[in-house]
């Protein structure tokens, strides 16, 4: 047979031998073919020519297939790294869950005066500064336009009052779930307004005028070796009703402080290196039995003071307010 002939039956037999003896040289395959099929293959060189034809055909097919998939690449990842915001100041007052217009003014005044007397140089507004219940799924009567304006005006009035009490302090506002309800409502019900920055809290409340920085809910505060956030992304499900601080520990395995739960709690454990890990939840500064949760008896008024040392170590004063007194 000439090297240019292409008998199908011979090609089929050669392909079977290639699959059966992978890695063998063409000469070895030719000898196996002659030994196995002496009536079909009788010459080493002619058999090698058939093998070259078959392997070139297979190779071309593989090359075409590989070239096709060479055009594919991994899609660009949109994954984001966890974001932190470091507070460099060392004497911090934590106020959270004020829920304007349902705030407790007496408790707010006590907490802020406590900070003023101790020369705090930073205030963390730990989320849910506004209530925004009409913008969520809770059963609530729809607000009038005047009510909505009042929500913003009252919140701005509070921010102005707070700045007047501590004019040189850094103020950082962490977005809470109630703060975010307005944006979620706009996104679903009024997307045109959602796309207008004027209706976002930082602009609508003139935060720049009061030198207040607003952090979105996914950003984590870092105060020395202590971390913090509003808490609604931390204590979900079964943890909140039992011991919020323990739920924070189970979730974060870090020194961590939250608001959100409207109750003061603490939990500490040590790791295998005997490093102490502490977690806290801070009480609220608003009504204790809101209309959407009228039977709750676990809420308490409270705030916290955090003192950070130069090496990052810290102390947390997790204060309660009971019958007009700080305890």
Feature map (PLM): residue ranges:
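Short, amphipathic alpha-helical "recognition" segments used to contact nucleic acids or chromatin
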Residues: 6-24
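DNA-recognition alpha helix
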Residues: 28-40
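Major-groove recognition helix of helix-turn-helix-like DNA-binding domains
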Residues: 39-66
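Mobile, glycine- and charge-enriched loop segments
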Residues: 71-105, 223-224
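Structural motif
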Residues: 90-92, 121-124, 226, 255-257
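Core catalytic region of metal-dependent phosphoesterases/phosphodiesterases
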Residues: 95, 100-209
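Active-site-proximal loop/helix segment associated with metal-binding centers of metalloenzymes
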Residues: 189-227, 231, 235-242, 252, ...
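Conserved beta-sheet core of the metallophosphoesterase superfamily
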Residues: 226-319
């Amino acid at each position: 047979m000439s090297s240019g002939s292409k008998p199908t039956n011979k090609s089929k037999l050669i392909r079977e031998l290639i699959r059966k003896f992978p890695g063998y040289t063409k000469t070895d395959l030719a000898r196996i073919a002659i030994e196995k099929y002496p009536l079909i293959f009788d010459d080493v060189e002619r058999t090698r020519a058939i093998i070259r034809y078959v392997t070139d055909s297979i190779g071309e097919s593989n090359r075409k297939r590989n070239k096709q998939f060479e055009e594919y690449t991994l899609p660009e990842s949109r994954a984001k790294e966890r974001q932190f915001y470091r507070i460099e100041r060392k004497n911090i007052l934590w106020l959270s869950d004020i829920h304007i217009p349902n705030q407790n003014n007496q408790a707010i005044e006590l907490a802020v005066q406590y900070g003023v007397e101790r020369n705090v140089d930073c205030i963390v507004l730990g989320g849910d500064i506004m209530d925004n219940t009409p913008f969520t799924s809770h059963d609530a009567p729809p607000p009038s336009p005047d009510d909505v304006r009042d929500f913003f005006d009252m919140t701005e009035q509070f921010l102005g009052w707070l700045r007047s009490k501590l004019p040189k302090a850094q103020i950082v506002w962490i977005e809470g779930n109630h703060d975010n309800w307005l944006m979620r409502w706009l996104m679903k019900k009024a997307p045109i307004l959602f796309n207008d920055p004027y209706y976002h809290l930082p602009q609508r409340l003139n935060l720049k005028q009061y030198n207040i920085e607003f952090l979105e809910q996914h950003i984590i505060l870092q105060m020395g070796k202590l971390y913090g956030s509003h808490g609604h992304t931390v204590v979900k499900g079964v943890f909140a009703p039992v011991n919020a601080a323990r739920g924070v520990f189970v979730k974060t395995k870090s020194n961590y402080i939250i608001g959100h739960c409207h109750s003061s709690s603490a939990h500490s454990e040590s790791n295998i290196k005997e490093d102490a890990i502490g977690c806290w939840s801070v009480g609220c500064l608003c009504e204790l039995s809101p209309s959407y949760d009228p039977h709750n008896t676990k809420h308490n008024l409270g705030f916290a003071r955090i003192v950070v040392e130069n090496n990052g170590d810290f102390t947390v004063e997790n204060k309660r307010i009971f019958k007009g007194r700080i305890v």
